[in-house]
Amino acid sequence: MSKRRKIFLLMAFVSATFFLENQENKPRIVSLSTTHSEILLELGAHNYLTAVDKHVSKGRFKNIKRVDSYIVNTEEILSLKPTHVIIAFKNEELEQIFLGSDIDLIFLPPAKNLNEVYDQILTLSKLVNKERVAQNIVEKMKKKKFEIISSVKPNRKRIYNELGYSYGIYSLNKNSLLGSFYTELGFVNIVDNVNTQEEYPKIEESLIIEKNPEIILVGHKEGVGSRVENRPSWSNISAVKNKKIIYLEENLANNWGISSVDLLDDIAVQTGLIQNVENEKRDSLHWLFYIVVIISSVLIMNNRTRKIKEHS
């Protein structure tokens, strides 16, 4: 056997060994959180995902197994042989089962503000070696947030965000992600001083009627009879009378991942604080174009006038 062939075979062996070791060390992630599943997919880490919760869109990555994150089947989870399991809400059963095992249970609760969103994106990126991708995403999110907040016109309108109605009225305060958005956008959230120990307090209908919100945002689905505008006792509320009821896109409103800044933009646009950031950019470019055209026209006219005077 020639020396060159021996070297080639040795290199092939080393490469194969490295590949197998890398495959063995690669995390096998089961994500029981829609938000974090979607973050990992946006980071380009689909090869690390063994399973995701069933609420993740099936339009992409159909080959990734879907599991129930509400009624967790622990036997099914264990059969997938994960190295890491991600949850967004406490699960004592999983904690007990994984205690002392080689499975890392990663608890990433609902973010209370955009800084926590950024931190969770960066935390997950380290797990799947996508730090640079995550850093770029976070920088873009921060830039877009700055553009939105700096475009907002000052206001102190009373606002109410409804999370649930049929089984009790639930809202949110400043200790939640959406609540932090309302604070930054300059709104007065009528629930901010109600049961501040919880981010998503249960409230009485009488409080909403008394506080008389000027804008109502709804982040859940209701039957026609339960819709805000069809509730008899709410007919004198300012937001109802003036048709200032906004139904947020449910998936966008209930997650706190990379799309969080899009939600902030959507709220700012739908409440009339600003135009869509992308539209504002286009409008600015149009105005810049018009100004350049006008200046160019004036310069051309002045030049022609000067030449006419020189020849006369």
Residues of each region from the PLM?
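Hydrophobic secretory-pathway targeting helix
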Residues: 2-24
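Short, charged juxtamembrane terminal tails flanking transmembrane helices
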Residues: 306-312
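Structured C-terminal subdomain patch of bacterial secreted/periplasmic proteins
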Residues: 27-28, 93, 113-129, 133-135, ...
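Alpha-helical transmembrane segments
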Residues: 293-306
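Basic- and aromatic-lined ligand-binding clefts that recognize polyanionic substrates
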Residues: 25-43, 133-185
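His/Asp/Glu-enriched short active-site or ligand-binding loop at hydrolase and phosphoryl-transfer sites
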Residues: 52-53, 176-199, 218, 244-247
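A short, structured surface patch at a secondary-structure boundary
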Residues: 28-90, 187-190
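Short helices/loops that flank or line small-molecule/ion binding pockets
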Residues: 74-81, 101, 202-212
